[in-house]
Design a protein with these regions (language model features):
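A ligand-binding cleft/hinge motif common to bilobed small-molecule-binding domains
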Residues: 107-117, 180-185, 212-246
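N-terminal secretory signal peptides
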Residues: 1-25
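An extracytoplasmic/periplasmic, membrane-proximal ligand-sensing/linker region
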Residues: 39-41, 188, 226, 275-336
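N-terminal (or domain-start) structured segment
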Residues: 32-123, 163, 171, 188-211, ...
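N-terminal signal peptide c-region/cleavage motif recognized by signal peptidases
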Residues: 27-30
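C-terminal lobe and pocket-closing loops
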Residues: 220-289, 322
């Protein structure tokens, strides 16, 4: 038996997800309550600055959902402590179906391994609503790096042990964990240069102060198009709509989970949010995500639309969790 089936936190999540799926069938009153919802404004808490990909996604969904539901949806950027403040605010909010968070893998999954203590337990204090979109990242290098694909890059970093630096948008970020794994498995002893955000990291990569980095497609594509950065590949097992000619690292022979796993943007709510309302929100999100203009805009920011059911989100989370946990261990990343 899979040991994870004995994890109390996971059992609680699965129970809530199954309860959500069954609620509309078992309780007619729940269906009536969900049909009346919402009767006032809804808040989407985004634990990141305005203007980033997650914020753009949240505002796009809020606009379309507001039209469908006939109520205002307020997007609140609650920034601070690597997304902890906004996520904690969601966990502590009334579980009445009027507060949700639109967040990333970092806050909903990774932070529990990066911090010895969090003010919230993501698997106890939140309920997953929908995996909104998958967010692969690009592996880019300075144009002077003599590599044009993944195999030649690995050969280059091996041949230059201890001489190369990679950047990330912060300790414990996807970019940090993936490059640390690459350095460790190739015995490359690359130096990690963490930045406070992706923009300064990309500027130093363009300037040649670091040699390689994983970066969002939203941030890297303009620099790739301008010839200021060279694209080596993208994470995941499918190519990105925004970079259709960019081969996946998996295609190029890097089949490790570290390169196949992708980040995601997801919606969660306070743990005791009524299952019928969780299901109703997921259903509405799926309808919005099917709109061609929404799918096109999401592709423009380097994401691919999913808009899953709560049950499917729990399954995806459970599949990804041991991969990310191992990447944190390999990197040695800690944030407290």
């Amino acid at each position: 038996m899979d040991e994870r089936s004995n994890d109390p936190s996971r059992r609680a999540w699965l129970t809530r997800a199954v309860a959500g799926g069954a609620a509309l069938c078992v309780h007619p009153w729940a269906l009536a309550a969900s049909e009346k919802w919402p009767t006032r404004a809804i808040t989407f808490i985004v634990p990141f600055n305005a203007g980033g990909a997650t914020d753009i996604l949240a505002r796009l969904l809020a606009s379309r959902l507001s039209d469908r539901l006939g109520q205002t949806i307020v997007v609140e950027n609650r920034v601070g402590a690597s997304g902890i403040l906004g996520t904690d605010a969601t966990a502590r909010a009334p579980a009445d179906g009027y507060t949700f968070t639109v967040s990333l893998t970092t806050n909903l999954l990774l932070n529990q391994f990066l911090y010895s203590k969090l003010p919230y337990d993501p698997r106890r204090d939140l309920v997953l609503v929908s995996l909104l979109a998958r967010a692969p990242v690009t592996l880019v290098v300075h144009p002077d790096v003599p590599a044009s694909d993944a195999p030649s890059l690995l050969a280059y970093i091996k041949a230059n042990k201890g001489k190369l630096s990679y950047g990330s948008w912060g300790v414990g970020s996807h970019g940090h964990l993936a490059c640390a794994y690459m350095s460790r498995t190739q015995d490359a002893d690359m130096i990690h240069a963490p930045y406070k955000g992706e923009a300064p990291m990309l500027q130093d990569l363009i300037g040649g102060r670091i040699q390689l980095a994983f970066a969002s497609a939203l941030g890297s594509k303009p620099q790739i198009d301008a010839g200021k950065l060279k694209l080596i590949g993208v994470t995941g097992k499918t190519r990105m709509d925004i970079l259709p000619d960019g081969r996946t690292l998996f295609e190029q022979g890097l089949t490790d989970d570290a390169y196949s796993v992708v980040g995601w943007s997801g919606m969660a709510a306070p743990a005791r949010t009524p299952p019928a309302l969780v299901q109703r929100m997921a259903t509405e999100l799926a309808a919005v995500a099917a709109m061609p203009d929404v799918r096109a805009r999401v592709a423009d920011i380097g994401f691919s639309v999913v808009a899953s059911s709560p049950e499917a989100f729990v399954q995806a989370y459970d599949q990804d969790l041991p991969i990310w946990e191992n990447l944190v261990k390999v990197s040695g990343a800690r944030l407290d």
